[in-house]
């Protein structure tokens, strides 16, 4: 089962709307609160975004990076969660936030990044959260 936005895309925009228990605007807090995703230890790796056809993933679906064991990463190679908008051969368009950004904004995450690019900035590492 995938997780999708429970509110409108417009309603997620704005400073500091999705905070974790420590008051930080982390990516996971956004996906959990806006799409109803459970704690990350319960996340399962679903369809790889780069292998999906243009209509296989619904707009508003929660996506995240996963490691080689199919788990949300705990290593130092990067991790991220976001809300999928669309994708093509060049990038995934998402809504996301991170602590230093402090708010949900749209952005592209590019395919074809060089070796060593952190997962959060490499579209090839994103999968649907199930």
Give the role of each language-model region.
Residues 1-80, 87:
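Secreted/periplasmic proteins that engage bacterial cell-wall peptidoglycan
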Residues 3-18, 85-130:
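Aromatic- and glycine-rich peptidoglycan recognition patches
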């Amino acid at each position: 089962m995938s997780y999708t936005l429970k509110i409108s895309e417009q309603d997620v925009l704005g400073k500091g709307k999705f905070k974790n228990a420590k008051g930080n605007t982390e990516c996971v807090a956004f996906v959990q609160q806006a799409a109803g995703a459970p704690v990350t230890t319960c996340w399962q790796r679903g369809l790889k975004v780069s292998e999906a056809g243009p209509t296989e993933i619904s707009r508003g679906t929660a996506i995240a990076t996963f490691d080689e064991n199919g788990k949300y990463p705990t290593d130092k190679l990067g991790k991220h969660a976001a809300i999928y908008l669309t994708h093509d051969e060049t990038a995934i368009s998402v809504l996301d936030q991170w602590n230093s950004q402090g708010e949900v904004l749209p952005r592209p995450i590019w395919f074809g990044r060089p070796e060593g690019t952190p997962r959060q900035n490499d579209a090839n590492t994103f999968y649907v959260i199930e």
